[in-house]
Design a protein with these regions (language model features):
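The feature marks proteins involved in alpha-glucan
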Residues: 1-32, 62-142, 147-155, 160
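Glycine-rich, histidine-containing beta strand-loop boundary motifs that form or position
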Residues: 35, 47, 72, 85, ...
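Short proline/glycine-enriched turn/loop motifs at strand-loop junctions of beta-rich domains
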Residues: 36-43
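Short beta-strand elements bearing conserved aromatic residues within extracellular beta-rich modules
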Residues: 43-45, 81
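Short, surface-exposed loop motifs enriched in S/T, G, D/E and P with embedded aromatic residues
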Residues: 55-63
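Substrate-binding/active-site clefts of carbohydrate-active enzymes
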Residues: 126-137, 144-284
């Protein structure tokens, strides 16, 4: 992995793999945390492994364009964390990781460590045989995982969904499943269209490894997967992207452009780093 190239493309606005650098990655020395916060005076990692503020870990500047990083040894998968950010005015913010790969279940809002290198895909045959489908018909079944079927008061897990959905799809002649947004979101009533975590699979239905298994089972049955994405606006919740480092960063700097009709914040698509953030999310 060429870190210098990833950073260069991220700042230029055309990165498709920013997630290889940013976020929390398990490496030989521990877990490497990297975050973009150009307006911050200081950034710390805090979490279950620091007893939160008691043993906060100060991050280092990777460059003069606002990238901060630190590698922390001896961390376990599923530990929770946030970034503690000191703004230019001296205020303190606690933010979830914009590049978090997993998160706590609402109403909790911390990010969670997950080792994506442990994912084991078994769909090589599907990938090798798939085409652009220009030469054959597609029949797409769209669903909201949280509402398709319920297990008492709870939605189906990915395993339960695979058990019942795959036979239903095959019996009714569908070729693809389109899943409404699976990125993390705080408000159930939004059906996933008001996103807080653009790299974080929502914890409502299971963890990334269980979703890995769901996709493998669908592909093994000859069923394609399409995932809806919301690259226009994001939630205003304090733990999220809004005024991430104390100033407008992911949103437009003026209030008229920043606020959407949905009670959310519009992404500032003029910002090169925001474009890289969204394009990398789509590629992820």
């Amino acid at each position: 992995m060429n870190l210098e190239r990833i950073i260069e493309e991220f700042h230029q606005g055309h990165s498709l793999n920013a997630y290889e650098l940013f976020g929390a990655h398990f490496v030989d020395e521990g877990v490497r945390f990297t975050v973009y916060a150009p307006h911050a005076e200081n950034v710390w990692v805090v979490g279950s492994f620091t007893n939160w503020d008691e043993n906060q870990i100060l991050m280092e500047r990777m460059n003069f364009q606002g990238v901060w990083t630190i590698t922390v040894p001896s961390l376990d998968e599923w530990e929770v964390y946030k970034y503690k950010i000191q703004t230019r005015t001296g205020s303190i913010l606690y933010k979830a990781d914009p590049f978090a790969f997993y998160s706590e279940t609402r109403p909790n809002t911390a990010s969670k460590l997950v080792d994506l290198s442990k994912l084991s895909w078994t769909d090589e045959k599907w990938l090798n045989n798939r085409s652009l489908n220009f030469d054959k018909p597609m029949n797409i079944y769209e669903l909201y995982v949280g509402g398709w079927k319920r297990n008492g008061e709870h939605p189906y897990s990915y395993d339960m969904l695979a058990d019942e959905l795959i036979p239903y799809i095959k019996e009714n002649g569908y070729t693809h499943i389109e899943l409404m947004p699976l990125s993390e979101y705080p408000f159930d009533g939004s059906w996933g269209y008001q996103v807080s975590g653009y790299y974080s699979l929502t914890s409502r239905y299971g963890n990334p490894k269980e979703f890995n298994r769901f996709v493998d089972r669908c592909h093994a049955a000859g069923i394609g997967i399409i995932i809806d994405m919301v690259p226009v606006h994001f939630v205003k919740d304090d733990f999220g992207l809004r005024y991430f480092d104390g100033e407008a960063l992911y949103e437009y700097p003026n209030e008229y452009d920043a606020n959407s009709e949905w009670g959310t914040m519009n992404f500032n698509l003029w910002n090169e780093e925001v474009r890289s953030f969204l394009m990398s999310s789509a590629a992820f």
